Protein backbone atom coordinates (compact mmCIF):
# COMPACT_ATOMS: atom_id res chain seq x y z
CA UNK A 1 0.00 0.00 0.00
CA UNK A 2 1.02 3.57 -0.51
CA UNK A 3 0.07 6.80 1.22
CA UNK A 4 0.08 10.43 0.21
CA UNK A 5 0.01 13.25 2.75
CA UNK A 6 -0.94 16.73 1.60
CA UNK A 7 -0.40 19.76 3.82
CA UNK A 8 -3.51 21.95 3.80
CA UNK A 9 -3.37 24.39 6.70
CA UNK A 10 -1.04 25.27 9.61
CA UNK A 11 1.19 22.41 8.56
CA UNK A 12 4.43 23.94 9.81
CA UNK A 13 3.70 23.23 13.49
CA UNK A 14 5.23 19.73 13.39
CA UNK A 15 7.70 17.83 11.24
CA UNK A 16 7.23 14.27 10.02
CA UNK A 17 10.16 11.86 10.17
CA UNK A 18 10.52 9.08 7.59
CA UNK A 19 12.70 6.04 8.26
CA UNK A 20 13.89 4.26 5.12
CA UNK A 21 14.26 0.58 5.96
CA UNK A 22 15.97 -0.26 2.64
CA UNK A 23 19.48 1.02 3.54
CA UNK A 24 18.86 0.06 7.19
CA UNK A 25 18.38 -3.56 6.11
CA UNK A 26 21.34 -3.49 3.68
CA UNK A 27 23.69 -2.16 6.38
CA UNK A 28 22.22 -4.18 9.25
CA UNK A 29 24.68 -6.17 11.38
CA UNK A 30 24.63 -9.88 10.53
CA UNK A 31 23.47 -10.85 14.03
CA UNK A 32 20.42 -8.56 13.87
CA UNK A 33 19.58 -9.61 10.31
CA UNK A 34 19.75 -13.28 11.34
CA UNK A 35 17.21 -12.56 14.08
CA UNK A 36 14.86 -11.08 11.43
CA UNK A 37 15.27 -13.73 8.71
CA UNK A 38 12.14 -15.83 8.26
CA UNK A 39 10.45 -14.16 11.25
CA UNK A 40 7.02 -12.70 11.30
CA UNK A 41 5.68 -10.13 13.69
CA UNK A 42 2.21 -9.97 15.18
CA UNK A 43 0.47 -6.60 15.04
CA UNK A 44 -2.68 -5.69 16.89
CA UNK A 45 -4.39 -2.39 16.16
CA UNK A 46 -4.98 -0.25 19.25
CA UNK A 47 -6.95 2.92 18.57
CA UNK A 48 -5.99 4.31 21.99
CA UNK A 49 -2.39 4.58 20.83
CA UNK A 50 -3.41 6.41 17.68
CA UNK A 51 -5.67 9.19 18.78
CA UNK A 52 -7.99 10.53 21.41
CA UNK A 53 -11.30 9.46 19.88
CA UNK A 54 -13.19 12.05 21.94
CA UNK A 55 -11.67 14.78 19.72
CA UNK A 56 -12.42 13.10 16.40
CA UNK A 57 -15.09 13.85 13.87
CA UNK A 58 -18.06 11.52 14.61
CA UNK A 59 -17.49 9.46 11.44
CA UNK A 60 -13.80 8.99 12.31
CA UNK A 61 -14.77 7.92 15.82
CA UNK A 62 -17.19 5.31 14.44
CA UNK A 63 -14.52 3.96 12.08
CA UNK A 64 -11.98 3.70 14.92
CA UNK A 65 -14.50 1.92 17.14
CA UNK A 66 -15.36 -0.58 14.39
CA UNK A 67 -11.67 -1.30 13.83
CA UNK A 68 -11.25 -1.84 17.55
CA UNK A 69 -14.20 -4.27 17.71
CA UNK A 70 -13.48 -6.16 14.49
CA UNK A 71 -11.01 -8.83 15.60
CA UNK A 72 -10.33 -9.98 12.02
CA UNK A 73 -9.22 -6.53 10.91
CA UNK A 74 -7.61 -5.62 14.20
CA UNK A 75 -4.80 -8.18 14.22
CA UNK A 76 -2.44 -9.47 11.55
CA UNK A 77 0.87 -11.23 11.07
CA UNK A 78 3.46 -9.89 8.63
CA UNK A 79 6.96 -10.95 7.64
CA UNK A 80 9.58 -8.61 9.08
CA UNK A 81 11.64 -8.66 5.89
CA UNK A 82 9.39 -7.72 2.99
CA UNK A 83 9.65 -7.04 -0.71
CA UNK A 84 7.43 -4.32 -2.06
CA UNK A 85 5.66 -4.58 -5.42
CA UNK A 86 8.82 -3.45 -7.18
CA UNK A 87 10.88 -6.18 -5.52
CA UNK A 88 12.79 -3.83 -3.20
CA UNK A 89 13.59 -5.46 0.13
CA UNK A 90 13.02 -3.67 3.41
CA UNK A 91 11.60 -4.12 6.89
CA UNK A 92 7.95 -3.90 7.85
CA UNK A 93 7.89 -2.27 11.26
CA UNK A 94 4.98 -0.76 13.16
CA UNK A 95 5.47 -0.31 16.89
CA UNK A 96 2.20 1.55 17.47
CA UNK A 97 0.22 -1.56 16.59
CA UNK A 98 1.39 -3.56 19.62
CA UNK A 99 4.12 -5.24 17.60
CA UNK A 100 5.51 -8.48 19.02
CA UNK A 101 7.87 -11.14 17.67
CA UNK A 102 7.35 -14.56 19.19
CA UNK A 103 10.46 -15.96 20.83
CA UNK A 104 12.47 -12.71 20.77
CA UNK A 105 11.44 -10.24 23.46
CA UNK A 106 13.99 -7.55 22.55
CA UNK A 107 13.85 -7.64 18.74
CA UNK A 108 11.23 -4.89 18.37
CA UNK A 109 13.29 -2.42 20.43
CA UNK A 110 16.53 -3.49 18.75
CA UNK A 111 14.98 -2.94 15.30
CA UNK A 112 13.63 0.45 16.35
CA UNK A 113 17.03 1.53 17.66
CA UNK A 114 18.70 0.43 14.41
CA UNK A 115 16.15 1.75 11.91
CA UNK A 116 15.62 5.17 13.46
CA UNK A 117 19.27 6.22 13.48
CA UNK A 118 19.68 9.70 11.99
CA UNK A 119 21.40 8.32 8.88
CA UNK A 120 18.22 6.44 7.86
CA UNK A 121 15.73 9.19 8.72
CA UNK A 122 14.54 12.15 6.67
CA UNK A 123 12.83 15.02 8.48
CA UNK A 124 10.20 16.82 6.43
CA UNK A 125 9.45 20.33 7.66
CA UNK A 126 5.96 20.91 6.31
CA UNK A 127 4.76 23.94 4.39
CA UNK A 128 1.16 24.27 3.25
CA UNK A 129 0.78 22.73 -0.19
CA UNK A 130 3.47 20.07 0.28
CA UNK A 131 2.68 16.53 -0.86
CA UNK A 132 4.61 13.45 0.27
CA UNK A 133 4.17 10.02 -1.33
CA UNK A 134 5.42 6.98 0.55
CA UNK A 135 5.52 3.22 0.46
CA UNK A 136 3.75 2.04 3.62
CA UNK A 137 5.34 -1.39 3.53
CA UNK A 138 9.03 -0.56 3.87
CA UNK A 139 9.00 3.11 4.93
CA UNK A 140 7.98 4.11 8.44
CA UNK A 141 7.00 7.55 9.56
CA UNK A 142 6.28 9.35 12.79
CA UNK A 143 5.16 12.83 13.70
CA UNK A 144 7.14 15.16 15.91
CA UNK A 145 5.65 15.51 19.38
CA UNK A 146 4.34 19.04 19.89
CA UNK A 147 1.70 20.71 22.04
CA UNK A 148 -1.80 19.37 21.42
CA UNK A 149 -3.27 22.83 20.84
CA UNK A 150 -0.88 23.31 17.91
CA UNK A 151 -1.80 19.97 16.36
CA UNK A 152 -5.51 20.75 16.62
CA UNK A 153 -4.99 23.58 14.09
CA UNK A 154 -2.91 21.52 11.65
CA UNK A 155 -4.68 19.98 8.65
CA UNK A 156 -3.08 17.24 6.56
CA UNK A 157 -5.10 15.19 4.10
CA UNK A 158 -4.21 11.51 3.87
CA UNK A 159 -4.84 9.41 0.79
CA UNK A 160 -4.29 5.65 0.85
CA UNK A 161 -3.56 3.61 -2.25
CA UNK A 162 -4.76 0.09 -1.56
CA UNK A 163 -3.45 -3.03 -3.21
CA UNK A 164 -6.12 -5.13 -4.91
CA UNK A 165 -6.55 -8.42 -3.00
CA UNK A 166 -6.68 -10.32 -6.32
CA UNK A 167 -3.20 -9.13 -7.16
CA UNK A 168 -0.47 -11.79 -7.56
CA UNK A 169 1.81 -9.86 -5.17
CA UNK A 170 -0.84 -10.08 -2.42
CA UNK A 171 -1.18 -13.85 -2.92
CA UNK A 172 2.59 -14.24 -2.67
CA UNK A 173 2.60 -12.36 0.64
CA UNK A 174 -0.25 -14.44 2.04
CA UNK A 175 1.33 -17.74 0.96
CA UNK A 176 4.79 -16.95 2.29
CA UNK A 177 4.23 -18.26 5.81
Language-model segments: what does each one mean?
Residues 1-131, 137-177:
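Non-heme Fe(II) oxygenase catalytic core, chiefly the N-lobe of the double-stranded beta-helix
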